[in-house]
Regions:
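An anion/phosphate-binding loop that grips the pyrophosphate of nucleotide cofactors and donors
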Residues: 78
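Glycosyltransferase donor-binding loop in the core domain
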Residues: 13-19, 92, 128, 157, ...
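Glycosyltransferase donor-sugar binding loop
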Residues: 12, 39-52, 64
């Protein structure tokens, strides 16, 4: 879908109070100023979309809401996922993070809760503090060097294949219903 040696970062999901996409946009602009060949693809919408569109340029693209299959097709063609969640947000393992894990892409991560940090160990990742643009830039430069590191595919599939997970839930419900 894409050509060239550009490294493509992507964000999937809601653009609202809990999600720190502004730091990512500012960070990508700094990376461009530093001569890095990067793009940011933001798929999703929400109350912050119009405010964030001020950062749109040739390398930062906002798609708005897309059908799930189209969103995943674009994400597959990208290189690095961005899990940009504010430190004040209460989210744990989000649908967004589940999709990122299923795609088995390296992740730039600002979430700090233990269960998310445990999952991050299954693939190349760099953590940064939400709201810290310079920290994001440094994490991005680090992950650019490590984006081809190994991924624990079998374990990710075991934990995130929805058909497998849902069947386990169905089996549990059926077992409980028969007790």
């Amino acid at each position: 879908r894409f050509r060239s040696k550009t490294v493509r970062l992507f964000y999937l999901g809601t653009l609202s109070y809990s999600y720190d996409v502004e730091t990512v946009c500012k960070g990508v602009r700094k990376l461009l100023d530093d001569g890095e060949n990067v793009e940011l693809h933001v798929m999703g919408g929400g109350p912050d979309l119009e405010k964030l569109k001020q950062y749109e340029n040739r390398a930062i693209k906002f798609y708005g809401y897309l059908p799930y299959s189209e969103m995943m097709s674009i994400a597959k063609a990208c290189d690095i996922a961005v899990n940009a969640i504010h430190s004040h947000a209460m989210q744990s393992v989000t649908n967004k993070l589940s999709d990122y894990m299923a795609l088995q892409k390296p992740i730039l991560n600002s979430q700090t809760n233990a269960e998310v940090l445990d999952l991050m160990n299954l693939l190349p990742h760099e953590n940064y503090r939400s709201g810290d643009v310079d920290g994001f830039v440094q994490a991005a430069k680090n992950i650019l060097k490590r984006k081809n590191d190994s991924v624990q595919s079998d374990e990710i599939v075991r934990r995130f294949r929805r058909d497998v997970a849902y069947q386990k839930i169905v089996n549990l419900i059926e077992r409980l219903a028969h007790e």
